[in-house]
Amino acid sequence: MRFTAPLILPAIFLAITAIVLEAQGPAGAASPDADSAAWSGTKWPEKDLGAPLLRDPIFVYNDWSAYDELSDNIPLTEQLAMKELDEILRLRKSGVRFDYYMMDAFWFDPDGGYRTWRKPNWPNGPNAWIKKCRDNGILPGLWFSTNTLVKINAAPEWQNSLTEKKGSMSFFEGGFLSNFMDSLQYWYDHGIRMFKFDFVDFNAATPETQRTKSQEEIQIRNADAFREALRKFRQRNPDIVLVAFNGFGGDVESTSGPFPFHNKVDLRWLEVFDSLYSGDPRASDVPEMNFWRSMDIYSDHMVRRYEQSFLPLERIDSTGFMLGNTGTIYYRKTNAWKGALILMMARGGWVNTVHGNLEYLTDEDARWFAKVQSLYLRLESMGRTKTFGGIPGDVEPYGFGSMDPEGTVYAVVNPAQVVQEIRMPLLSKEQGPLGAGRLLFEDAGFKPVLSGDRVKLGPGQMALVGFGKYARSTYDLGVQEDVRIPGSIRPVDASFVGHGKNTIEATVIMPKHGDLRLVMRQRSSDGNIMRSWKGGPPNGTNMGNFFQLRAWQDGKPVPVEIHYDKVIWSGLSWAVGEIKHDAVTAGQPVTVQCSSGENDAVDLEGKTYEVEY
């Protein structure tokens, strides 16, 4: 029911108006106290704006992927951590902003109950690192595996909270939670201001409780106990940042799983966490010739799914930007890093996490990095970000639009094996016409075609488009030369048939001018997209050997160029390769074959395309 207060309660309204005007002072007069709330005259410190959660976007450096002790054997050491801190300070000179340094997994002594640091990796403990961070205006953070025993042993105080298998602890039984929160407070008192919680287990219960309580009741009691403990921790330490990772809801293994999530996201976690993450970087189930673009699509897809689960974009940490030469990031180094950075910012999260080896970025790279930050930090802080288009994992064109009163920036992606046009809609009814736009960034190869509020993209291409103030050349970000998109693509008829176990084969006519692109997708016998997990480094299987694409002409093998030939800890459901036109005779038959190394029977789907670069 809508009503107008002056008409319903004129006397009360006039009285309230008089009180408000008295509190504000004479018309046009400045407030006598800049920290006072104008409507009440009550003193309200500026630092409390938005409390107890983040008031503005932040940038976090995380050293995971510079080292990797899970899918690789590169350890975290004090030397590595201090080196990356020096790199932060170097990048700052070029304008890059970092607010926090998150020390990720396994800094702790396995027998120290999160109170002591691992030796010999940290012979003198963390004091030098903490001091150097704080001396340079960077707030340090620490990673915890919450209530699971990941490379840590149960402290004496945790023993009466252990599960029967002794792999995790109950939050609502025994001494674990109290001791754990004391450890967090200990580190706060020693200068830590950001806390990352990973690998949580809400199914944990002591053997007696496991026998007498339902699993649902155990989950509820664990979540309630931990959430209340974090709430009290926040009240005591209002300047902390808390971030949630694995176990706090959502299904992050693939982009082809059912939705809504089987593991629902409890929105009450937003009462205590500044952000929830949406999955570590991995390939999506969308095949792409450029492996890194498929990873972009994964992060884009998961952010959309978490948004559809009613999380505000500001509270989702896509964790989509990692540099490094470790197994966790598939030895990416800096491949296609510019597009990954733009998309991380474009997704609208307020916790923007940069992982890995900062030394891989040159000073010139740093200046470009700072330019992207400057663009998006203003849009995130002063404006809004909204999603539009289709669902990334459904292979539909999509994007993220960010606006402020002066203009709009659209990050757009075409995940399909076809040239497609996408409309960039107005993001608000209050928004005026877009006017003339400008391409600010694009992948190499196919030249995006901008026409009014529409842009045409090549297969697997991303671009950035600015309108209003952001259509000026000063916002140009250039071309991503290490992602090359075909100038044209068209399907080539191919009838694939079975050719032995988990193998399909077809004979096609090699295009007269372009290359032949071969795309394979793997499904289980029930028709669902199926990932194969063959382990991480150093002992995992290279997926280029597991998913094999072969070709012959006149009985002789011809090379097939692939980019998925990596040891992929997170699994893969597809393969894409190209036969270059100068490696075969154009216009003549070529036999192509796709195979999977799965032991059980799978269904393989093959398609071929002519692509010209």
Functional labels for PLM-detected ranges:
Residues 1, 19-29:
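Basic/polar N-terminal segments that are highly enriched at the extreme N-terminus
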Residues 1-9:
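Bacterial N-terminal signal peptides that target proteins for export
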Residues 8-22:
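Bacterial N-terminal signal peptides
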Residues 25-151, 328, 350-393, 402-408, ...:
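Conserved structural scaffold segments of CAZyme catalytic domains across common CAZy folds
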Residues 30, 62, 226-448, 452-465:
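Active-site-proximal substrate-binding groove within the catalytic cores of carbohydrate-active enzymes
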Residues 76-93, 174-188, 337-338:
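Short, acidic/polar
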Residues 97-319:
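Aromatic- and carboxylate-enriched substrate-binding clefts and catalytic-loop regions
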Residues 385-396, 405-407, 412-613:
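C-terminal beta-sandwich/jelly-roll accessory domains of carbohydrate-active enzymes
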